[in-house]
Every structure is written in structure tokens, then in C-alpha cells.
Regions:
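Active-site/acyl-donor-binding loops of N-acyltransferases
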Residues: 2-38, 151, 155-221, 355-401
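A conserved beta-strand-loop-helix scaffold within acyl/acetyltransferase catalytic domains
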Residues: 40-86, 90-104, 151-153, 194-334
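Short, high-confidence coil segments that cap the C-terminus of an alpha-helix
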Residues: 75-77, 138-141, 295, 351-354
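Glycine-rich, N-terminal phosphate-binding loop and its surrounding beta-alpha-beta segment
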Residues: 105-156
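A generic structural signal for short coil/turn motifs at secondary-structure boundaries
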Residues: 117-121, 268-271, 331-334, 365-368
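Aromatic (often tryptophan-rich) hydrophobic motifs at membrane interfaces
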Residues: 130-131, 281-400
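A structural signal for short, well-ordered beta-strand segments and their strand-loop junctions
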Residues: 142-149, 249-251, 301, 356-358
Length: 401
């Protein structure tokens, strides 16, 4: 167990975000690969160790890790590799498959994956995706769903906050982006011409993984620079937490009970349906203790004299540090424990050399008075950009079940 003060020396409030350009923020979330591998490509099963090594080399989601596979015992789990014409392993993905009752057909799913050289994929999508489709057909899948992680567009936080304050954010399609990726547009055009239908577009209550996420760029930025990128209220709250004596510590599976109590309290307060405690215990155990490992998880607790006021589950995968779930009590809210917790996690991510702090998704249809708007504003206040990815698409492989 590690205990820290959220900030021993918080600099004076300084106006301005001090953040790099939007394209640099995109690079912080997704690296481009060069030179491009040589096709044609083939896919075949690989070991879980090979999957993890490839994911760490190319970058990828926690949902594509062998650790995540361990949290899905009811699914068939396959580590799949992409091989170049030279026989080199150039990509990998975790395929989760689930059989239909009484039928010899399955649903195949790669959440937020696979991990590929996506800049190269966008140049010739069929060369990369068609071998996967053929493999899934051969495995008896009736449908295949992919979470295409290529960054499409970005919005700076001020743009989104301004739109919300002026009457609500009904759709990101009507909001001019800070950056727009030609590679993503090319990939989307290829998908639209084919049988790939979009899944879960719109708010995050829909099925599937979020298409819009909030990400703080950490690449080549110090903790002070990230702090300057937060809004004034966030910086004030970090100072308040320090004055209130809030300390932040990291714990393992032993922190699940307290975490779930706070998470469940938050669910009642914010009107969402909470996951079972066993889900979180399984996740922390699967990813392993702490966040020092390249693939690992920890529960962060913000407390005053041992009274835990806020708790959050964090996962690290390579250069990405992700805030997955959190909860806070209504007790002693003036201590600003949630701000202290997030600030400490960001500082830890910087110390670990991570390039991005991922605050995950949000509801994308928000009015100024929506109960979920506060969560988005909380994420924007920390200096997070809104990142849109190409998102989830599904193809039907066999209609004759």
C-alpha cells in the first residue's frame, strides 16, 4: 500500500492550458507505424504471450489483453495474429466468441481491437480485414464485430464546454472538430461501401464500446504543464483537497469492498445500474497488483485520516493509463477527494512514462441540465480532449443459421 498527498506544492493558478496541438494529442493516443508491413496478410492463432507483446509494441486497449480474456470465462477466447508475406507477426487481436444456444454458430467480437498498424490498414483495409472475416467464417461465426480504434476526430475541451453552456450538446456531428483524420475517413468510406453496419453509435448506454472518449495528453508534458491545462475550478479543488488533508493510496483486491460501496452509492445518486462486486474483484485479480507493470491494475483510494471518500479502478496497458470506474460518498464533499484522486493518478501515469490518461466514454447527447452533463464537464475540466474513433462495426457472415 502506498500513501501520498495529492499535491505538496501546487503551483499558483495560471491561465491557459499550455497543451500541444490537437494532432499531437491524437499521437498521444495512437501511434503510427512505419514502414508498412508487406501483404498479403494471413491470420492464425497465436499464444497469449505473443498477443500481449504485440499489443504493447503497437499500442492497444485493455479490452484486447490476455488479462481481459481472464475476466470472460463464459466466452471462448482466441489470441489471433496477423502475419505479413515475410512471415512476420505484424498485428494481433483478442477474439471473444460465444455460441448460440442449440446452434453450431457463434458471435465473434474484438472489443476496441485488434492492435494493428492502423495507418497502413486505412490505405488498404481489405488486405487486413478480409483475412479476419475468412477466419471467422471458418470458425463458424454467424456475425463478427470489430471495434475500429483509429482516431477519427478530436475536439478541445473549451469547444465542447462552450456548446453545452449555450444550450446543450445534441450531436457531435454538428460541432466543428479541432482535427479530422483523412485516414479515418478513408477507412469509414470503405466500411460504408461494404456490409459493415455501425453498432452503438450515439450515447454510451447503447450496446457496444464508446465511440467518443475523453483523453488527457501526457506526451512530453510535466505534471506542472498538465496542471496548467486544467480549468481554474479543478486547480482550486486540488488545493482544497491538499488543505483538507486528503491523501491518496493504491490498494489491490483488498480494496474492492470499499470501492464497491462507494460505487454503489454513486449509482443510486446518479441513477445508473451498478455492476456486481465480483466483476471488479475478478478484474483486479486478472490484471495483477499495482500499476507499475506494463499490464496491471490498482484501486485508488482518497481518504482523510483513513475515512475513504472516493475510490477508482485504474488500469495501465503500456503507454495508456485508464480510469475505468469510480465512486464517491456524499460525506465531506468539500474535501474534493475525487479531484485529489484523479490528480494523483495522472501524476503516477506521468512518472510511469505513459503518454495518455484515458477517462473513457460519456453520453454524447447532453443538454445543459442533463444529469450526465456533470460527469462530462468533470472530465473536460481536467484538460481532456474529446476523441472520436471509427468505432464498432458488425458484419453478418451467415444468415442461414
Amino acid at each position: 500500500m502506498t500513501t501520498r498527498h495529492p499535491s505538496e506544492h501546487v503551483p499558483d493558478l495560471i491561465e491557459g492550458r499550455g497543451a500541444p496541438a490537437a494532432l499531437d494529442r491524437v499521437a498521444a493516443m495512437q501511434q503510427t507505424q512505419a514502414p508498412a508491413p508487406n501483404g498479403p496478410f494471413t491470420v492464425r492463432p497465436i499464444s497469449m504471450d505473443q498477443l500481449e507483446q504485440t499489443l504493447l509494441a503497437l499500442g492497444g486497449s485493455f479490452l484486447q489483453t490476455p488479462a481481459w480474456a481472464q475476466t470472460k470465462p463464459d466466452w471462448r477466447r482466441t489470441a489471433l495474429g496477423w502475419f505479413s508475406s515475410d512471415g512476420d507477426l505484424v498485428g494481433a487481436g483478442l477474439v471473444l466468441s460465444r455460441n448460440l444456444p442449440r446452434l453450431k454458430r457463434s458471435f465473434a467480437y474484438l472489443p476496441e481491437g485488434p492492435s494493428l498498424a492502423w495507418a497502413s490498414v486505412a490505405e488498404d483495409p481489405g488486405a487486413w480485414i478480409d483475412p479476419l472475416v475468412a477466419w471467422a467464417k471458418g470458425e463458424g461465426a454467424f456475425a463478427l464485430r470489430l471495434g475500429f480504434p483509429l482516431v477519427s476526430r478530436t475536439w478541445e475541451p473549451e469547444i465542447v464546454k462552450k456548446q453545452i453552456s449555450e444550450g446543450g450538446l445534441m450531436s457531435f456531428t454538428s460541432l466543428d472538430p479541432t482535427s479530422d483524420s483523412p485516414a479515418a475517413r478513408s477507412l469509414e468510406a470503405w466500411l460504408d461501401r461494404g456490409p459493415w453496419r455501425p453498432i452503438g453509435w450515439g450515447n454510451t448506454a447503447a450496446v457496444g464500446q464508446p465511440r467518443y472518449v475523453c483523453v488527457v495528453n501526457l506526451r512530453d508534458r510535466s505534471a506542472d504543464e498538465v496542471l496548467k491545462g486544467m480549468n481554474q475550478q479543478w486547480r482550486r479543488n486540488i488545493k482544497k483537497a491538499a488543505k483538507a488533508g486528503v491523501q491518496v493510496r493504491t490498494v489491490g483486491v483488498e480494496g474492492v469492498d470499499t470501492f464497491h460501496d462507494l460505487y454503489a452509492e454513486t449509482a443510486v445518486r446518479d441513477h445508473f445500474f451498478p455492476r456486481a462486486k465480483s466483476y471488479f474483484a475478478q478484474m483486479v485479480s486478472a490484471f495483477g497488483p499495482g500499476t507499475e507493470g506494463r499490464v496491471s491494475a490498482a484501486i485508488y483510494e482518497a481518504h482523510v485520516d483513513g475515512d475513504v471518500l472516493a475510490s477508482a479502478l485504474m488500469v495501465r496497458v503500456g503507454d495508456m493509463f485508464s480510469y475505468l470506474y469510480g465512486g464517491a460518498t456524499s460525506r465531506n464533499r468539500d474535501a474534493r477527494a475525487s479531484n485529489a484522486l484523479q490528480w494523483q493518478a495522472i501524476q503516477d501515469a506521468i512518472e510511469l512514462g505513459c503518454s495518455a490518461y484515458d477517462l473513457r466514454g460519456f453520453n454524447t447527447s447532453l443538454g445543459a441540465t442533463s444529469p450526465l452533463t456533470g460527469l462530462l464537464l468533470f472530465k473536460l475540466g481536467v484538460g481532456a480532449d474529446v476523441i472520436e474513433v471509427v468505432g464498432e462495426r458488425e458484419i453478418v457472415l451467415n444468415t442461414f443459421w
